[in-house]
Curated annotation (Swiss-Prot):
Residue numbers spanned by region Disordered: 88-116
Signal sequence annotation: 1-15
GO cellular component: extracellular region
Organism: Ostertagia ostertagi (Brown stomach worm)
Transmembrane domains' residue ranges: none
The protein's name in its UniProt record: Aspartyl protease inhibitor
Protein encoded by which gene: API
């Protein structure tokens, strides 16, 4: 049973859109999952991952008001969609002949776009040995240390480009290995479709990967840890 649950979770994780780039010990992009991660506004003051950035101007304050309303509407739409799915499931379990309809992606509630004052550049954190960089500022622990100079900013941008290529390669490798191990999407769909298409067979094709695997780039030397 535990294996089945693990397999289903793996399938969901691989199918879900990525909202974070994550490499342990190097880059972590917080996605605003509770607490103080991501962008937080209180008293018209903007924080990113717990660090104070600045006060919102009047235009941004109005943008925040509009965003709050959009979030409330989105939550209500999600709640209604879940209620309809639950009622449909209950009817089918009660023996009523009701065709299962998979909602189209365009019919699903859409999360509102983040305000313009909360960007990926604001919430991206680069973790190096001894320090962390966010918003082109160096922190030691939670203490602000200094600003990056222009050369260091450019160096960080180049590092992020190379690191992104490396991460995408690694993720494709993992997806290919999981697909080969569990038989691809058909393995997971069998749990939810009850194996309705009996006798059918498919071949999982591994994604095409570069012949030469990219190397993980060395991190910039913005701080020195004393061992």
């Amino acid at each position: 049973m535990k294996l089945v649950v693990l397999c289903v979770l793996c399938g969901i994780a691989l199918a879900a859109p990525r909202q974070k780039r994550l490499t342990v010990g190097t880059i972590a992009v917080t996605g605003g999952v509770g607490g103080s991660t991501g962008c937080v506004v209180t008293g018209n003051v903007l924080y990113a991952n717990g660090f104070r950035l600045r006060e919102l101007n009047p235009s941004e304050q109005q943008e925040l008001v509009n965003y709050e309303k959009q979030v409330a509407d989105y939550k209500a739409a999600v709640k209604q969609a879940l209620k309809e799915r639950q009622e449909s499931l209950k009817s089918r379990m009660a023996g009523k002949k009701e065709k299962a309809v998979t909602p189209k992606e365009e019919d699903l509630p859409k999360a509102p776009q983040k305000p313009s004052f909360c960007t990926e550049d604001d919430t991206t954190q680069f973790y190096f040995d001894g320090c962390m960089v966010q918003g082109n500022k160096v922190y030691v622990g939670n203490t602000f240390a200094r600003d990056l100079d222009q050369n260091e900013i450019q160096e960080l941008k180049e590092f992020e480009k190379k690191q992104t290529v490396y991460q995408e390669y690694v993720q494709k490798q993992i997806q290919a290995q999981v697909s080969n191990l569990f038989g691809g999407a058909d393995f997971f769909s069998s749990f939810f479709n009850g194996g309705s298409e009996k006798g059918s067979s498919t071949t999982t094709v591994a994604p095409v990967l570069p012949e030469d695997a990219p190397e993980q780039p060395a991190g910039p030397n913005f701080c020195t840890r004393i061992y």
